[in-house]
């Protein structure tokens, strides 16, 4: 919820799904909870044909109360708006600048607080950077105090939605230094 700077990533592109599933993010992972949101059209099918669901562990009061509280706090504290602002003012510009400074950065893509920096051996062919060098970038970040999510040849920047602009900028600077050390 809110990671891209909108409640759901699909909101950025005007997508109107028939069904959305969700889980731990709805209550910040405090208590296991998942759910489904359906369109009015899909919901209408149950007007005359009941859904044979509703098991003994459904509708758990503690889990749903924690979700209501988490969503209320996210709304009141404008967490989603903050994620959008972080992407627009700090993460996006900072990470995109890495393209100009490091030949091993082949692409930077993202929105809000959900970014990926693609590491390449060659920008033209997009040949992935060797795993050992990707690991060296990760290790450089960890040594400086940031634990990035690394998948294949991508360094993902997915900070907490409540991170400050200064701390987000520090994370970008740590990645910048780690990239410089590797090449």
Question: Where are the predicted features?
Answer:
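Conserved N-terminal phosphate-binding loop of PLP-dependent enzymes in the Aspartate aminotransferase
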Residues: 1-183
């Amino acid at each position: 919820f809110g990671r891209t700077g909108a409640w759901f990533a699909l909101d950025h592109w005007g997508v109107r799904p028939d069904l959305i599933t969700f889980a731990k993010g709805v209550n910040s992972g405090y208590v296991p909870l998942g759910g489904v949101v359906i369109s009015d059209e899909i919901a209408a099918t149950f007007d005359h044909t009941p859904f044979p669901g509703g098991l003994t562990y459904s509708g758990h009061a503690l889990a749903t109360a924690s979700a209501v509280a988490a969503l209320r706090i996210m709304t009141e504290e404008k967490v989603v708006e903050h994620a959008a602002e972080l992407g627009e003012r700090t993460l996006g510009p900072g990470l995109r600048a890495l393209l100009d400074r490091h030949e091993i950065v082949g692409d930077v893509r993202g929105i809000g607080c959900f970014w990926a920096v693609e590491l390449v051996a060659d920008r033209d062919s997009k040949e992935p950077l060797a795993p050992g060098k990707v690991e060296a970038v990760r290790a450089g970040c960890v040594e400086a105090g940031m634990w990035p999510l690394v998948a294949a040849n991508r360094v993902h920047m997915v900070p907490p939605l409540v991170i400050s602009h200064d701390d987000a900028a520090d994370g970008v600077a740590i990645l910048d230094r780690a990239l410089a050390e590797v090449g």
